[in-house]
Regions:
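Histidine/acidic residue-rich metal-binding segments in metalloenzymes
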Residues: 1-51, 63-79
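Short, acidic/turn-prone active-site loops that include or flank metal/cofactor-
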Residues: 56-61, 84-86
Length: 195
């Protein structure tokens, strides 16, 4: 919050207003955290087609607050899920984001749809703004980024409950094989190649 106070004291403007003045906002700009933004700033982010990445574990670990991430998603702002280096396990970020917003909003139904949307749709759309390959699908011509997870579900798994299985049953420690851009990098937990 110190950066917001600094901007208000020295420039009489909020952070996103200053970014707008400098021409920084736009479809190739990715804002991190956005913890203390208000409705006006969200409007600017939306109008400029700027993207946001939510880093729940970093925000919690630094005790700097909970951003209005659910509102960003509901306003149609392209929002992804990240780690800010706090962890490298996106399933953990998925879990933390899910419970953080339930707790913050005092609503056990919050974040069920928004967090998987950020992880599986938002992250793909954000990456596609920077990389020419088709991402997020398994089809000819796409980047073919795939992980294989050693997971034995205790209950039947299908398309309707896969997100719940990922949320409650899987962790990054269960990844046994990784394929990036069609190239096997790790097989049976052994590194076999570099990018």
């Amino acid at each position: 919050i110190e950066d917001l106070h600094h901007c208000l004291k020295h420039y009489g403007k909020r952070i996103v207003d200053r970014l707008m003045d400098w021409g920084i906002l736009g479809e190739k700009t990715l804002l991190g955290h956005c913890i203390y933004i208000n409705g006006h700033e969200m409007d600017l982010i939306k109008e400029t087609n700027t993207m946001v990445v939510h880093n729940p574990e970093s925000n919690m670990g630094n005790a700097c607050g909970c951003p209005p991430t659910m509102e960003l998603v509901h306003r149609g702002i392209l929002t992804g899920l990240g780690t800010d280096g706090y962890t490298h396990d996106m399933t953990e970020s998925y879990k933390v984001a899910n419970v953080l917003h339930k707790h913050h909003l005092c609503d056990p139904n919050a974040a069920w749809g928004e967090v998987p949307q950020m992880l599986f749709d938002g992250n793909v759309k954000i990456a596609e703004r920077y990389f020419p390959q088709k991402l997020g699908v398994l089809k000819e011509g796409a980047a073919a980024d795939v992980i294989v997870v050693d997971y034995d579900p205790l209950t039947p798994m299908n398309g309707g409950n896969a997100n719940s299985h990922i949320l409650f049953g899987m962790t990054g420690k269960q990844v046994v094989t990784t394929v990036a851009n069609g190239k096997v990098l790790m097989k049976d937990r052994e590194l076999v190649s570099c990018l």
